[in-house]
């Protein structure tokens, strides 16, 4: 999810966010479950434009699906984001967010107060891929700066740490990241109706949607 503006009440966005409007054939208000695999193209030129990303549209279900698209748009709208990508799990979102900014030889600085599954993902899987993970005590935001060097590609934290529920100093660490040119990635465990990390300087927001969807 990437930052943009928002204006509607969150309750309205939760119900009506995204580009879906009532079905013109059935007048159904709820978003249908589209069981898609592939899509029909209007012409060879249409297909060419879609694959060349010259115009928006559905290409293949492993890339996009109309039901997923509404979910992505709705979550992005709730967070005040430009766009979102739905993945298979919260752990996939955590890995995806890091692997988009870091590669072998790079490092990230992560809060010590995070979900155990994420700690294992970072401490074992990311390190096996060559991405060093440095853990910082968030009780002092300067700990993130102390662990930063020219190979640091991201800061990572949870809004409310799982399971301690201590509040992460988003604004302070985001400001350190801004000065260092490093994005702060936040797993918004608090849900956007309680906290919007973008409002406090986060660059990327991720979710495990089973927590609140």
How would you describe each model-predicted region?
Residues 1:
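Ligand/cofactor-recognition surfaces for anionic moieties
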Residues 4-65, 73-74:
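N-terminal "arm"/small-domain region of PLP-dependent enzymes with the aminotransferase-like
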Residues 4-5, 16, 21-22, 83-213:
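Conserved PLP-enzyme active-site core in the AAT-like
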Residues 11, 40, 45, 55, ...:
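Glutamate identity and glutamate-enriched acidic tracts
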Residues 28-29, 80, 129:
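Short, basic and Ser/Thr-rich N-terminal targeting/leader segments
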Residues 43-95, 117-125:
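Conserved N-terminal alpha-helix of the aminotransferase class I/II PLP-enzyme fold
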